[in-house]
Amino acid sequence: MAKENGFIGSIDQGTTSTRFIIYDHDARPVASHQVEFTQFYPEAGWVEHDPMEILESVKVCIAKALDKATADGHNVDGGLKAIGLTDQRETTVVWSKSTGLPLHKAIVWMDARTSSICRRLEKELSGGRSHFVESCGLPISTYFSAMKLLWLMENVDDVKDAIKKGDAIFGTIDTWLIWNMTGGINGGLHVTDVTNASRTMLMNLKTLSWDQDTLKTLGIPAEILPKIVSNSEVIGEICKGWPIPGIKIAGCLGDQHAAMLGQACRKGEAKSTYGTGAFILLNTGEVPIKSGHGLLTTLAYKLGPQAQTNYALEGSIAIAGAAVQWLRDSLGIIKSASEIEDLAAMVDSTGGVYFVPAFNGLFAPWWREDARGVCIGITRFTNKSHIARAVLESMCFQVKDVLDSMNKDAGEKGSLNNGKGEFLLRVDGGATANNLLMQIQADLMGSPVVRPVDIETTALGAAYAAGLAVGFWKEADIFESGEKAKNSKVFRPAMEEGIRKKKVASWCKAVERTFDLADLSI
């Protein structure tokens, strides 16, 4: 990329933390700040966030990152051209447009409280859990925003009353942040982008607008929904009271779509982001592909109001890095997440132990809300290193399950190979710093894994979207620059095919052991 003065900022609002990163014209991070926030677990299977705490975390991250950039000699004042925003998807907020206050804590994407609503709809609607797939690409599941919104409408009196009074508005985290950053109760913009909207189960994938039949079927009033915009356009300006008033918000994507853009994935290329969960997306180009193997049809990105829409197949895994957090916080096997690599490397195998982290059920490609976690194959020989390695393997097995489904769905309709005839999985996210995890992934797939120099591509993707909208970058800068690829690390498979097949068969047996466990009682 040609050098040019100026910077792009990126808000990365994730499941467990918020970050703000400032990039220069060469897409290099020059400063960043990260803040963790509180996770609430009011009941088994429930996960909530405080929207006000998230809002404050964004303010703090912006201010601190600006201070760091200035302290390091970067002329950010007057040089920040725009900001992009990426967020945890599906997490649902309903708030009062008159007071600006949330009417309930945010219900997080992995929250499973809506299982009874899902079962009810599956029985009532033709096609069962696939009733809405034709229009929105998604099955009926606790995962998506529509079910969370229905729960709030049915169970929270403040939400019911506000809807009756015309005072309630709904949004995912991007909508909540943009509304507050552009004025809040004083004219804040009520918008979302096409990728976040595609995860609500309410947007028609072909028209990219709210699906009126779906709204009618579910009884959701259209007036509480935000306007849908593309991923790369000037949405509005940041209001007074924020560290960067007057700066344009020019890009917005859900986190996994941002990572795909950050990895510059073209048609036929896939990426896997390893975070709290793991999310694998395959860019299928301009035509949505309907999955017959447990995947979701969704958007990849739309880089401008008049730009073509790129679609994707997605496999969403609920628990990946969260299993490592569980080892740390609940079992005390490790003191920090980074310790798991050395602990797992103390043994050459799991010793026959298989761990399936179905804490709140299983997502793609199994879609079993009745599943619960299991750890099998334990003997007196088993020690904590075997458990740690089994946890790492569980992340990789789940990714392989999704990739196998992608190959079945898209193998004939879209290329899954590069010019050398091999499949490459591009990876990103904090957990990919774990070299052992990446080698296990390559071994279990039997294919190379490519890790970029900057593994936090989610924030980079949001920055790219904003930079494109204001002319800071061109698409060629993103999709044709080979500089990042030159420095990528490639992990190649070293496991014998016979061993791989045996391990995969054992994993599938372990997964089956998780089924029908949700109703177990003491």
Swiss-Prot record:
GO terms for cellular component: cytosol. Pathway: Polyol metabolism; glycerol degradation via glycerol kinase pathway; sn-glycerol 3-phosphate from glycerol: step 1/1. Keywords: ATP-binding, Cytoplasm, Glycerol metabolism, Kinase, Nucleotide-binding, Plant defense, Transferase. Highly expressed in germinating seeds and senescent leaves, and at lower levels in roots, leaves, flowers and siliques. Gene3D superfamilies: 3.30.420.40. GO terms for biological process: defense response to bacterium; glycerol catabolic process; glycerol-3-phosphate metabolic process; response to bacterium; response to microbial phytotoxin; response to molecule of bacterial origin. Disruption phenotype: No visible phenotype under normal growth conditions, but mutant plants accumulate high levels of glycerol, can grow on synthetic medium containing glycerol and have increased resistance to salt, cold, osmotic and drought stresses. Coiled coil: none annotated. It is found in: Cytoplasm, Cytosol. InterPro entries: ATPase_NBD, Carb_kinase_FGGY, Carb_kinase_FGGY_CS, FGGY_C, FGGY_N, GK1-3_metazoan-type, Glycerol_kin. Key enzyme in the regulation of glycerol uptake and metabolism. Required for resistance to nonhost Pseudomonas bacteria and to the pathogenic fungus B.cinerea. This is Glycerol kinase.
